[in-house]
Curated annotation (Swiss-Prot):
This is Urease subunit alpha. Transmembrane segments: none annotated. PROSITE patterns: UREASE_1 (PS01120), UREASE_2 (PS00145), UREASE_3 (PS51368). The gene is ureC. InterPro entries: Amidohydro-rel (IPR006680), Metal-dep_hydrolase_composite (IPR011059), Metal_Hydrolase (IPR032466), Urease_alpha_N_dom (IPR011612), Urease_alpha_subunit (IPR050112), Urease_AS (IPR017950), Urease_asu (IPR005848), Urease_asu_c (IPR017951). Its main location: cytoplasm. The keyword Metal-binding applies. GO terms for cellular component: cytoplasm. Its EC number is 3.5.1.5. Carboxylation allows a single lysine to coordinate two nickel ions.
Length: 570
């Protein structure tokens, strides 16, 4: 039998079982767990390569079963499915098959048929992940959407109407008129989008109006008054209409303390935004709710991870975002009450043990929309350096930790918001919202972003050059971002009630509406993939020290991070 060295094989076809790959410049190393391609029967495109007529390409038409696109020999990194090598077949904008691609007339073991109508994306030596989902968006400016797309985000959920002061501070789109205008604008963007309506009301009628107007979730924000009455009313409407509720609790403890908020929630499922508290919430102990079985806790990325710069930048951010004045002592006291190094340090560790389930951005409102992936992996790297390997690791690799952290911005927000039937993981039947990465740039700069099976964004060189690579090389929208390809490739997520009421026709939009589902009692902390820990968390009211199941949670701030200036010269 002919043999080939591992190095030569990896160079031609990408890594296989037992090979390890470093993620960017972090200390995180993944190991290939299985390989669904067949050694000696690999398919590869190019001059003198396999995918040619009568060789790796069959005579099968699309109607007879050939797929639209194959991503060849990709290294899949997925929270649920694991870390493995495979060919990925796409059809009708969804993942049609995961396995071995080729020509069944000439090759054994083919599960994905390549035909004359099949396009090829070379995944050799590349990492493939599900598109990211940022579930904490302030829609302050439309340019955020392109910024997020170019970082590997393919779904955004949040609220707002533009740079209005309500939107600068809160992720709420108030009322059906604003809801309609925002949804109509979404036809312009190659991004899956869902809106959160304002959830602050003590009577249900106005909230029901927003859910019927297209909101796929409701947001309770302290700047609108997150009182026990508003919490109870909002959750009751959410239960009636099967939409998620996100909460930003009462930092000033004016209408009650964390215990009063928990009592008002009454055990119902809720997504707690920036649960550490720097982004807002009962001071100093909102972090305690991350141990409750009905609370899905998340972080926003400015506190990710804890560094020597974290505290200093937060005070100014907070003053701007919440319309505070540095000349008013009470405003300064409000801001300072939210920024605590002890709880931010504990947040790092709570992520590492899987007690915090989601990471999002808080775009332009104390968060950076293009850095969800970067901040997630910087946190994972910091925790490995400070805490070593996780006890769940089964080999000399970081596979479990990597799967835990990628879940935080893919499958877990998708489950929390009722979108996991369509997005969040690499699985047959789900939307082909996919991101291809060069391992050296993993989490920082994608090689290619697909939305609904079509390439929507990629780095591209001078369009007038003789080849695609000459400078200036930068991210540009691709054909999936234009015309009706854009509206046929991405969707708008709404409530089932809005979908069934005929809202799509009344608004005259082109993008398909997809209803969220299973956001209430059927899910909770136990539903969070690899991030379902429920420790008993306590906060010392004097020192702000955080303990989980009696253990003090503390760590040093990072002075140097990976995925930073090495990748961004300008």
């Amino acid at each position: 039998m002919a043999r080939i060295s591992r190095a030569a094989y990896a160079q031609m076809y990408g890594p296989t079982v037992g090979d390890k790959v470093r993620l960017a410049d972090t200390e995180l190393f993944i190991e290939v767990e299985k390989d669904l391609t067949i050694h000696g029967e690999e398919v590869k495109f190019g001059g003198g390569k396999v995918i040619r007529d009568g060789m790796g390409q069959s005579q099968v038409s699309r109607a007879q079963g050939a797929v639209d696109t194959v991503i060849t020999n990709a290294l899949v990194v997925d929270a649920g499915a694991g870390i493995f090598k495979a060919d990925i077949g796409l059809k009708d904008g969804r993942i049609a098959a995961i396995g071995k691609a080729g020509n069944p007339d000439t090759q054994d073991g083919v599960t994905i048929i390549i035909g004359p109508g099949t396009e090829i994306i070379a995944g050799e030596g590349k990492i493939l992940t599900a598109g990211g989902f940022d579930a904490h968006i302030h829609f302050i400016c439309p340019q955020q959407i392109e910024e997020a797309l170019m970082s590997g985000i393919t779904t955004m959920l949040g609220g707002g109407t533009g740079p209005a002061h309500g939107t600068l501070a809160t992720t709420c789109t108030p009322g059906p008129w604003h809801m309609a205008r925002m949804i109509q604008s979404f036809d312009a963007f190659p991004m899956n989008i869902g809106l959160s309506g304002k959830g602050n009301a003590s009577l249900p009628a106005a909230l029901e109006e927003m859910v019927l107007g297209g909101a796929c979730s409701l947001k309770l924000h302290e700047d609108w008054g997150t009182t026990p009455a508003a919490i109870d009313c909002c959750l009751s409407v959410a239960d009636d209409y099967d939409v998620q509720v996100m909460i930003h609790t009462d930092t000033l403890n004016e209408s009650g303390f964390v215990e009063n908020t928990v009592a008002a929630i009454k055990g119902r499922t809720i997504h707690a935004f920036h649960t550490e508290g720097a982004g807002g919430g009962h001071a100093p102990d909102i972090i305690k709710v991350c141990g409750l079985p009905n609370v899905i806790p998340s972080s926003t990325n400015p506190t990710r991870p804890y560094t020597v710069n974290t505290l200093a930048e937060h005070l100014d951010m907070l003053m701007v975002c919440h319309h505070l004045s540095p000349s008013i002592p009470e405003d300064i006291a409000f801001a300072e009450s939210r920024i605590r190094k002890e709880t931010i340090a504990a947040e790092d560790i709570l992520h590492d043990i899987g007690a915090f389930s989601i990471i999002s951005s808080d775009s332009q409102a104390m968060g950076r929309v293009g850095e969800v992936a970067i901040r997630t992996w910087q946190t994972a790297d910091k925790m490995k350096r400070q805490r070593g390997a996780l006890p769940q690791e089964t080999g000399d690799n970081d596979n479990f930790r990597v799967r835990r952290y990628i879940a935080k911005y893919t499958i877990n927000p998708a489950i929390a918001h009722g979108l996991s039937k369509d997005i969040g993981s690499i699985a047959v039947g789900k939307r082909a919202d996919l991101v291809l990465w060069n391992p050296a740039f993993f989490g920082v700069k994608p090689d290619m972003v697909l939305v609904g099976g079509m390439i929507a964004a990629a780095p591209m060189g001078d369009p007038n050059a003789s080849i695609p690579t000459p400078q200036p090389m930068h991210y540009r929208p691709m054909f999936g971002a234009y015309g009706k390809a854009r509206t046929n490739s991405s969707v708008t997520f709404v409530s089932k009630a809005a979908l069934e009421s005929g809202l799509h026709g009344r608004l005259g939009v082109e993008k398909q509406f997809v209803a969220v589902e299973n956001t209430r009692g059927g899910i909770g902390k136990h539903s969070m993939v690899l991030n379902d820990a429920t420790p008993h968390v306590e906060v010392d009211p004097e020192t702000y020290e955080v303990r989980a199941d009696g253990e003090l949670l503390t760590c040093e701030p990072a002075t140097v991070l990976p995925m930073a200036q090495r990748y961004f010269l300008f």
